[in-house]
């Protein structure tokens, strides 16, 4: 597995969950002897929704909601077999979306 790279992208709505997951991944990779770059915070995506409160009149009465999607990027530069096995066994929080790509 030399000369390969594992790129891990994490997405979550809660920044505490994503930070906890990134520390678990980085500690696991370093424990197995791999070189880690990151976590790199990517731009947070903010989606805003405006909803009319009144069903009939009062166009001025509106509520605004926002969903923030936090993203992190981790590169594992020189993974070993132990690193891949440890990352596969790692149990992360339920609210974190993980995308793994080999390159």
Curated annotation (Swiss-Prot):
InterPro entries listed in its UniProt record: Ribosomal_uS10, Ribosomal_uS10_CS, Ribosomal_uS10_dom, Ribosomal_uS10_dom_sf
GO biological process, one term: translation
PROSITE patterns: RIBOSOMAL_S10
PANTHER family assigned to the protein according to its UniProt record, in alphabetical order: 30S RIBOSOMAL PROTEIN S10 FAMILY MEMBER
Record's function text: Involved in the binding of tRNA to the ribosomes.
HAMAP family in alphabetical order: Ribosomal_uS10
Protein name: Small ribosomal subunit protein uS10
Species in which this protein is naturally found: Buchnera aphidicola subsp. Acyrthosiphon pisum (strain APS) (Acyrthosiphon pisum symbiotic bacterium)
Origin organism lineage: Bacteria, Pseudomonadati, Pseudomonadota, Gammaproteobacteria, Enterobacterales
